[in-house]
A protein has these predicted regions:
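Structured secondary-structure scaffolds
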Residues: 26-58, 399
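Short acidic, low-complexity intrinsically disordered linear motifs used
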Residues: 389-405
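Internal maturation/activation junctions in enzymes
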Residues: 116-138, 164-256, 328
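Structural signal for hydrophobic packing residues in well-ordered secondary-structure cores
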Residues: 22-25, 41-46, 103-106, 112, ...
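Function-dense linear segments that define catalytic or interfacial modules
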Residues: 45-141, 146, 151-161, 265-268, ...
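Alpha-helix capping and helix-loop boundary segments enriched in small/acidic/polar residues
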Residues: 28-32, 42, 66, 87-90, ...
Length: 405
């Protein structure tokens, strides 16, 4: 396969080109069993936890870009077009992470639209304010103005609503939340475009053609939650066609470990590993309790209590339906749930196929409980006495300005 043809990877013409070379007798070939290849991938991922997976086809079909997405970043949530540079002042494209996260665990429903608007406007100013040491990064960022706004505190949000990750009601709740989230972010970008003009590369997005995430998602997600909407997407579509968008993308779900700690929120979209955890960093250790522990202890989904990944996969799939970039989604396994304390390859294969079927663009870490206890406190009742008074939310705390984002 020549370089020119390899550039078709991820596009509609790739399958046709691949079959052409596959059928050509003059092209040397080496066959490997697909089952063997996938098994090797899954075993290596299980052993290292760090073989990341990107579904490049869906990363493009469900992208907001007409330009091809070739790759993701280390954390697997950024799916932006890139183009190589030959020297430091080259005119390729370097994609940057312009990120923010909203603590959905403490945001009231009536506040969400305003907070989404503030997040978009804050990052909008940051794009123009920051310095760019590399020309290719500056040109691409200023022209595309791609943002990645996501969640922290999703586990807290679900616990407040008394639903578990494995509940059908949780998937419906996340569908409702994420629909509003993406809608309000797009609405804000559309308003800013009316004020300042659309981004320079707006015509290189599917949004410019009136195509929205609800048009391009994997329709298998409808098996999880019916495609019923509460927002006026057709009005938004018309407004985008009229005034454009200031930003090529609005959403991405980052790991958000650090920001979750500083906000005393649960980590991103992840179930907590325990009620009281020890967070470690270069600056030392910090004990962190889940929000509203006294009131919501029984409502939280703990990571290692989940029997499998099904509920979590469905939550991420529903989010990805609306997100225009990617999601740092993890696979997690408790060997105690399986015979001989060993996670079968068949279980991992099922999760691989389900993440693909339900539209995951990328898969980040694979976590396996190893029985170590230094990172969590397994008996929080006695250990948390010194932490509950200052850290646990009260019934009135939602009205406290200090807790607002």
């Amino acid at each position: 396969m020549c370089i020119r043809d390899s550039e078709a990877f991820g596009t509609d013409t790739f399958d046709e080109m691949y079959q052409k070379y596959e059928n050509a007798y003059s092209v040397p070939k080496k066959k490997i069993s697909a089952r063997e290849l996938i098994t090797d991938l899954l075993k290596e991922r299980a052993e290292t936890g760090r073989i990341y997976i990107m579904n490049i086809d869906h990363s493009n079909t469900h992208s907001s870009f007409l330009d091809k997405v070739n790759m993701s970043n280390l954390c697997q949530e950024i799916t932006l077009p890139t183009d190589p540079i030959q020297h430091i002042d080259g005119e390729g494209e370097i994609a940057l992470c312009i990120l923010s996260a909203i603590n959905v665990g403490v945001v009231k429903d009536e506040e969400l639209e305003e907070i989404c608007d503030l997040a978009v406007r804050g990052l909008e100013e940051l794009i123009d304010y920051q310095e760019y040491p590399v020309k290719a990064a500056e040109m691409s960022t200023l022209a595309r103005r791609s943002l990645g706004i996501g969640y922290i505190g999703l586990a807290h949000y679900l616990a407040k609503n008394r639903v578990k990750y494995s509940d059908q009601s949780a998937w419906s709740l996340v569908h409702e939340l994420t629909e509003k989230f993406q809608y309000y972010l797009l609405k804000s970008s559309n308003k800013i475009a009316k004020e300042k003009g659309a981004c320079d590369y707006f015509d290189r997005t599917k949004y410019a053609q009136g195509i929205l995430p609800i048009d391009t998602y994997k329709k298998d997600v409808d098996e999880i939650v019916k495609p019923e909407y509460n927002m006026d997407w057709e009005e938004l579509r018309a407004n985008i066609l009229t005034n454009g968008l200031r930003h090529s993308t609005l959403t991405a779900q980052m790991p958000s470990e650090s920001s979750s700690v500083t906000s005393n929120a649960t980590n991103g979209i992840e179930p907590p590993r325990d009620y009281l955890s020890v967070k470690k960093s270069k600056k030392g250790t910090l004990k962190q309790i889940v929000p509203q522990y006294s009131h919501l202890k029984s409502a939280y989904t703990l990571l290692w209590d989940m029997p499998d990944n099904t509920g979590y996969i469905n939550v991420v799939a529903v989010m990805q339906k609306f997100f225009d970039q990617g999601i740092s989604g993890n696979w997690s396994y408790n060997p105690e749930n399986y015979d001989n304390n060993e996670v079968p390859v068949s279980v991992m294969a099922r999760d691989l196929l389900n993440t693909y079927k339900y539209g995951w663009k990328t898969s980040y870490y694979q976590n396996t409980m190893d029985g170590k206890v230094e990172d969590v406190i397994t008996d929080p009742n006695s250990a948390m006495n010194d932490y509950i008074p200052p850290l646990t939310h009260t019934d009135n705390e939602e009205d406290c300005d200090a807790c607002a984002i």
